[in-house]
């Protein structure tokens, strides 16, 4: 065979060889975070003004000598110091913005507030992450988060050395600043890998005295009423004038009132920005009770961080009015239908505030001037059935955080299953419409209250058990005597009673 024939034969064989297919390289998918144990200590206390002093922002750094965590006294329970705060983290899936820095997100929220609707972002701006979040199936972790929320109500320790954050505060306005605003206690674990922010909630004057009460009532009725606390019982404290007819509401008007810069949500965002500037590489969890729980949820939806609340007022209604960023395909007006938010709302069935039923003409909340008409929570609801399990009657007295810790969380052997409730709807009787903001609104009154699609009991009565004054009970076992806690019970610090 000649060289030419060999060459032709080799070329023919080469043409018969099939090309080698190269398998596509799969994208690297990070492993979900493993379960871990954390021990938290109190590191800082932040205070941000809202109404009287909206530019005030102060910080107190806690030293090891005064880093004690206190559970406030309440209804026969003495204030006491709590031992180590232990919590377990586990993988938690959250859909959130890729770039979640406050310097990036806050202008988006401001733009939505100015234009009256949520800006549409590209799908590439969103991601679904498995983050290290609190293990809400673990009783000890839920208890620790509740104690952090409760600690946010304790004023002290003593005369704290407060430092201004940002521009110096006018010292001539110093008097009374501590009673106005939003306060957050910041806890961190041993290596600062995770921090928890506990936010201060509501302290209604009709139940517990003054403090931030009056401001909280304004915010509560802006947040949680269908339309400015209008067209309800005469006792409701009206906060704006957006009703244009019988059960007809200018939602643009409500949205504008809700987004004023001196409101709690804006103060909470600034507080969050300053805390995360101190801990830029840490995982952030947020805990709160009552109004503090709802505001915590707003922060979680804004920045994509895990949130655990206790007896939070249903938050979906105001969340849909705040201009929060929403992923593609989500309904901005129904945030309760959005999954993977990282929010878990713990509560029990005897609390009319948590259940969204404290709004009838004879309800305690209505007598106090509160128009709490919202019924839907974002994220997941984790409900203890104290009515069915313990025979409790619905009553406002069951809302307090210390009672929830003592009589609910500690008494149950396990935590409830957390359920997603996207079918819930708020303000079913109302017709909401958007406008260009130039209409003149009028006020009209009606003796009835707004109904909702979710069935709730509207009876606000005292608990089935005898009142604290009537029943004799043994002295409660102090928390530091329980297996999870260590420490003593020295003289209690100055404190602020809460609802």
From Swiss-Prot:
Query: In what ranges is there compositional bias, type Low complexity?
Result: 438-454
Residue ranges, Cytoplasmic side: 1-9
One of the GO biological process terms: neutral lipid catabolic process
Q: Which residues of this protein are catalytic?
A: 290
Ranges for region Disordered = 436-499
Primary subcellular site in the record, as a coarse category: membrane
Q: Which reaction does it catalyse?
A: a triacylglycerol + H2O = a diacylglycerol + a fatty acid + H(+)
Give the stretches traversing the membrane: 10-30
- What InterPro entries does the database record attribute to this sequence? AB_hydrolase_fold, ATG15_Lipase, Fungal_lipase-type
> Which keywords does this chain's UniProt record carry?
Autophagy, Endosome, Glycoprotein, Hydrolase, Lipid degradation, Lipid metabolism, Membrane, Signal-anchor, Transmembrane, Transmembrane helix
Per UniProt, subcellular location reads as: Endosome, Multivesicular body membrane; Prevacuolar compartment membrane
**Role of this protein:** Lipase which is essential for lysis of subvacuolar cytoplasm to vacuole targeted bodies and intravacuolar autophagic bodies. Involved in the lysis of intravacuolar multivesicular body (MVB) vesicles. The intravacuolar membrane disintegration by atg15 is critical to life span extension.
**What is annotated about its quaternary structure and interactions?**
Binds to both phosphatidylinositol (PI) and phosphatidylinositol 3,5-bisphosphate (PIP2).
UniProt lists the family membership as follows: Belongs to the AB hydrolase superfamily. Lipase family.
In Swiss-Prot or TrEMBL terms, this protein is called: Putative lipase atg15
Query: Which organism is this entry from?
Result: Chaetomium globosum (strain ATCC 6205 / CBS 148.51 / DSM 1962 / NBRC 6347 / NRRL 1970) (Soil fungus)
């Amino acid at each position: 065979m000649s060289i030419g024939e060999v060459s032709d034969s080799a070329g023919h064989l080469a043409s018969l060889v099939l090309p080698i297919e190269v398998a596509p390289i799969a994208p690297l998918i990070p492993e979900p975070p493993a379960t871990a144990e954390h021990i938290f200590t109190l590191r800082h206390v932040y205070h941000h003004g809202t109404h009287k002093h909206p530019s005030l922002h102060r910080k107190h750094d806690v030293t090891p000598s005064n880093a004690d965590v206190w559970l406030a006294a309440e209804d026969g329970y003495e204030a006491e110091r709590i031992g180590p705060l232990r919590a377990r983290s586990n993988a938690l899936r959250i859909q959130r913005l890729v770039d979640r820095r406050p310097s990036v997100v806050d202008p988006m929220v401001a733009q939505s507030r100015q234009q009256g609707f949520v800006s549409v972002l590209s799908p590439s701006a969103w991601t679904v992450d498995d983050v290290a979040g609190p293990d809400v199936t673990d009783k000890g972790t839920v208890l620790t988060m509740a104690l952090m929320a409760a600690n946010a109500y304790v004023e002290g320790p003593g005369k704290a050395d407060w430092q201004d954050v940002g521009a110096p505060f006018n010292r001539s306005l110093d008097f009374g600043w501590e009673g106005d605003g939003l306060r957050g206690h910041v806890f961190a674990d041993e290596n600062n890998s995770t921090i928890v922010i506990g936010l201060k909630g509501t302290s209604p004057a009709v139940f517990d005295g003054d403090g931030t009460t009056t401001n909280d009532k304004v915010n509560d009725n802006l947040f949680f009423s269908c339309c400015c606390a209008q067209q309800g019982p005469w006792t409701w404290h009206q906060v704006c004038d957006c009703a244009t007819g019988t059960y007809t509401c200018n939602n643009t008007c409500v949205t504008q009132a809700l987004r004023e810069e001196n409101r709690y949500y804006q103060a909470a965002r600034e507080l969050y920005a300053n805390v995360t500037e101190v801990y830029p590489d840490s995982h952030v969890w947020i805990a709160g009770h009552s109004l503090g729980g709802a505001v915590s949820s707003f922060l979680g939806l804004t920045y994509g961080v895990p949130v655990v609340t206790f007896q939070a007022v249903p938050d979906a209604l105001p969340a849909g009015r705040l201009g929060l960023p929403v992923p593609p395909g989500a309904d901005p007006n129904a945030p309760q239908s959005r999954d993977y938010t990282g929010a878990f709302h713990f509560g029990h069935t005897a609390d009319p505030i948590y259940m969204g039923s404290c709004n009838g003409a004879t309800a305690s909340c209505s007598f106090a001037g509160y128009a709490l008409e919202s019924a839907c929570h974002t994220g997941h609801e984790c409900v203890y059935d104290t009515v069915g399990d313990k025979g409790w009657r619905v009553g406002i007295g069951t809302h307090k955080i210390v009672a929830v810790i003592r009589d609910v969380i500690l008494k149950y052997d396990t935590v409830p299953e957390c359920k997603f409730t996207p079918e819930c709807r708020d303000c079913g009787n109302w017709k909401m419409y958007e406008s260009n903001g130039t209409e003149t609104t009028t006020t009209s009154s009606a003796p009835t209250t707004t109904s909702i699609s979710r069935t709730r009991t509207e009876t606000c009565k005292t608990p089935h058990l005898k009142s604290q004054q009537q029943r004799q009970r043994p002295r409660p076992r102090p928390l530091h005597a329980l297996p999870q806690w260590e420490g003593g019970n020295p003289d209690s610090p100055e404190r602020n009673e809460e609802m």
